[in-house]
Amino acid sequence: NDDQLATVISHEVAHALARHGAERVTQGMIQQGVGLIGSVAVAATAPQYQNAFNQAYGLGSNLGVMLPYGRMQESEADEIGIYLMHKAGYNVNEATKFWENMSEGKSGGNDFFSTHPSSQNRTKDIQTVINKIGNEAK
């Protein structure tokens, strides 16, 4: 339906408004720069550990920084998207239905290894935003 389509469109517009693409590029450049500096330092002092460092740094920086940052951006886009839907006159309650429909047939999964919040957390957080909008309107 139109309201659920607005959920997707407003979510993607929110990514653009929040400049998530630019943030991702910056984060990636920082990650690579720090990794390069670390790799050079290890190569200069203990070259036998350079490969191990590179693998550990790559895994650690992705799990510890990049994935959580991506989940935060997704949650932020969800929240901004709900406000955009509300301002445009769409039924924001359809957003939770949309994300529930999207999660059908998928396992619950673990946020830790994902770029997106779990469906359960996502719908809970979206409902919180919807409730906040309802309270602000009163």
Regions inferred by a protein language model and the residue ranges of each:
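A Zn2+-metalloprotease active-site environment signal
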Residues: N1-K138
